[in-house]
Amino acid sequence: MCLLIDAGNSRIKWALADTARHFVTSGAFEHASDAPDWSTLPVPRGAWISNVAGDAAAARIDALIEARWPALPRTVVRASAAQCGVTNGYAEPARLGSDRWAGLIGAHAAFADEHLLIATFGTATTLEALRADGHFAGGLIAPGWALMMRSLGMHTAQLPTVSIDAATNLLDELAENDAHAPFAIDTPHALSAGCLQAQAGLIERAWRDLEKAWQAPVRLVLSGGAADAIVRALTVPHTRHDTLVLTGLALIAHSA
């Protein structure tokens, strides 16, 4: 049994896995929220941790583990040149984020023998190009949908700051009034829809460019907390998989 922890910038996801492909239980919590209830969980043989949220998150994770399972072995996952069938095409492999690395491993296992474009939607939107043979060819990083909207609100004099929940409601209203209207007629709707279309445009352009470059079909795989909203703006085929990082961590743990 392995404890898997994926600490992102917005929240911490975790799972207990008894094999490389099966989660016994899982959950998620915000960085500032109450601790998860691990009191009934069996003792794992160790914890495998991907943390891109910094030192404060690392200290909290250590404290949570120590409170429930003192002295439990912990492995902080870092990207390497090759692991679990994936080779790292980064110029400096160790500089690739651990979440992106684990996600690549999870995606390669889930969609074996397929070329992939993996789009993950969190605080940042990341795109990873993964060949069918497991070679990570490179990626793109852009502000996430929420960060785009928040940045416009913070760094302009007259634009509002719109949250994801508010933007989703605004887009629902826009769709109900005219599902085919390409442009909004007020600022909050325009900001919400514009930032959403920017996300969709990035993804669709990258997907088309990758299929052209590789001269082969590429599966577009979507993951992350903001995927529900962004899916509505996409016009290309796609597949959802919301546990890529945890799946990759499970594979890393069971290969140790």
From Swiss-Prot:
Cofactor: NH4(+); K(+)
Residues the record lists as binding substrate: Y90, G97, S98, D99, R100, T187
Keyword Oxidoreductase: no
Broad class of where this protein is predominantly found: cytoplasm
The record's free-text note on cofactor binding: A monovalent cation. Ammonium or potassium.
Active site: D99
GO MF terms held by the record: ATP binding; pantothenate kinase activity
Keywords associated with the record: ATP-binding, Coenzyme A biosynthesis, Cytoplasm, Kinase, Nucleotide-binding, Potassium, Transferase
Keyword Protein biosynthesis: no
SUPFAM superfamilies given in the database record: Actin-like ATPase domain
Chemical reaction(s) catalysed: (R)-pantothenate + ATP = (R)-4'-phosphopantothenate + ADP + H(+)
InterPro entries: ATPase_NBD, Type_III_PanK
Pathway listed: Cofactor biosynthesis; coenzyme A biosynthesis; CoA from (R)-pantothenate: step 1/5
GO terms under biological process: coenzyme A biosynthetic process
Enzyme class: transferase
Domain of life of the organism encoding this protein: Bacteria
EC number: 2.7.1.33
Positions of ATP binding: D6, A7, G8, N9, S10, R11, I12, K13, T123
HAMAP family hit by this protein: Pantothen_kinase_3
Family the UniProt entry places it in: Belongs to the type III pantothenate kinase family.
The protein's role, per its UniProt record: Catalyzes the phosphorylation of pantothenate (Pan), the first step in CoA biosynthesis.
Name of protein: Type III pantothenate kinase
Species name: Burkholderia mallei (strain ATCC 23344)
Gene, per the UniProt record: coaX
